[in-house]
């Protein structure tokens, strides 16, 4: 039923715990493909500069590159773990200042059947019922969203 599943990850242990759920849900081989997505967010003062004059001396590509290198390495490491367990995996690093928007747009554009996302990621604000990115994805998505709570990740 779910042939294309999107798993957004932000580098946190809580986000990565979703992978154990993906493995358990699809251990029977019913999953066609999982896509691991990392949204690289740039929220630097120069990112908000409006005029070309403001940023003409800043090489934005040189600033972005290390973030994408780190993102791609992170996803490649996770990909190799899943591939070694027999899963078909794709990875994607995308730039986006609003991760929930980037995730839902990507899911729609790529025809994903489901999104599996941790409720609390990098910020890990435990007092919130659902983290802001997961909340945004849940409310914007037109495909099923499986939320993974941090409590389900404890050994």
Q: Which role fits each region the language model picked out?
A:
Residues 35-37, 90-94, 146:
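General small-molecule cofactor/ligand-binding pocket signal
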Residues 77-115, 153-155:
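Structural beta-alpha unit
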Residues 1-58, 83-85:
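Small/aliphatic-rich secondary-structure junction motif
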Residues 39-41, 96, 150:
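Active-site loop/turn elements of alpha/beta-hydrolase fold enzymes
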Residues 18, 46-49, 101-104, 127-128:
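Short, well-ordered secondary-structure micro-motifs
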């Amino acid at each position: 039923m779910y042939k294309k599943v999107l798993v957004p990850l932000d580098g946190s242990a809580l986000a990565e715990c979703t992978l154990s759920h993906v493995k358990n849900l699809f251990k029977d081989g019913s999953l066609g493909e999982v896509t691991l997505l990392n949204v690289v967010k740039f929220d630097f003062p120069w990112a908000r500069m409006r005029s070309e004059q403001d940023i003409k001396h800043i090489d934005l590509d040189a600033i972005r590159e290390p973030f994408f290198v780190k993102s791609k390495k992170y996803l490649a490491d996770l990909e190799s773990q899943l591939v070694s367990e027999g899963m078909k995996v794709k990875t994607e690093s995308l730039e986006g200042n609003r991760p929930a928007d980037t995730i839902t747009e990507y899911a729609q554009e790529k025809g994903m059947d489901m999104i599996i996302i941790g409720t609390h990621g990098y910020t890990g604000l435990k007092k919130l019922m659902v983290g802001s990115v997961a909340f945004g994805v849940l409310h914007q998505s037109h495909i099923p969203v499986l939320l993974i709570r941090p409590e389900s990740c404890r050994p």
